[in-house]
């Protein structure tokens, strides 16, 4: 799809990229420059894939755009595809990921504490959030590592799988949740 050019296009772009779905198999993938507030690429897509995002970014580079940074929803492998470009994982999407694992009303004390901690993300710096996440882990490590044994097979699995998944998601994504702090000169957003 072609975008009508109303304003001069920027030479440098801070890319916010996301796909919005209308129904199950029709989506619109948009790459927008957060500086000029212009959509630089708009495509109809059936599915959201890393290959489509890579192709859209390559097309922008071929048009002469210098991609200064990327803010995205954190699809698996997407942030690692562009090691030369500072990439920020959308903090709002990270909160949604934790919500998917814990629900909005966790039942356990550990889950409630992690849910409250997750809500401090937007107001925290990396060092403070990392320290609070580590303190949460140290307080709840035993609970997090509890295992349940299947009496028939003798095999075991983690009892609190969704809590572990929520914690590990935050821990794994920590470096990408605060990229904007490491590059203040770029004026990066922390959310899509």
Where do the PLM segments sit?
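RNase H-like nuclease fold core
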Residues: 1-76, 80-85, 173
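Intrinsic structural disorder
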Residues: 1-2, 33, 62, 93, ...
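Short conserved micro-motifs on helix faces and helix-strand junctions that flank
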Residues: 15, 90, 190-192
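Residue-level signal for alpha-helical context at structural boundaries
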Residues: 38, 55, 78, 88, ...
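Intrinsic-disorder/low-complexity, polar/charged segments
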Residues: 49-53, 90, 122-129
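Acidic/histidine-rich catalytic cores and adjacent linkers
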Residues: 65, 72-76, 116-192
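Conserved beta-strand -> loop -> alpha-helix junction used to position metal-binding or nucleic-acid-contacting
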Residues: 69-118
């Amino acid at each position: 799809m072609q975008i009508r050019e109303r304003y001069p296009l920027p030479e440098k772009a801070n890319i916010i990229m996301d796909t919005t779905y209308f129904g199950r198999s029709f989506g619109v993938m948009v790459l927008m420059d957060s500086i000029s507030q212009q959509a630089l690429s708009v495509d109809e897509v059936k599915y959201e894939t890393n290959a489509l995002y890579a192709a859209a970014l390559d097309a922008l580079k071929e048009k002469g755009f210098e991609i200064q940074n990327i803010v995205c929803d954190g699809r698996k492998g997407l942030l690692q595809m562009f090691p030369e470009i500072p990439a920020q994982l959308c903090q709002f999407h990270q909160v949604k990921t934790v919500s998917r694992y814990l629900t909005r009303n966790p039942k356990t004390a550990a889950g409630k504490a992690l849910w409250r901690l997750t809500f401090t993300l937007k107001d925290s710096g990396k060092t403070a959030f990392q320290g609070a996440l580590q303190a949460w882990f140290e307080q709840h490590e035993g609970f997090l590592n509890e295992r349940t044994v299947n009496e028939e097979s003798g095999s075991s699995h983690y009892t609190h799988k969704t809590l572990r998944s929520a914690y590990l998601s935050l821990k794994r994504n920590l470096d990408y949740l605060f990229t904007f702090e490491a590059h203040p000169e770029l004026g990066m957003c922390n959310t899509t």
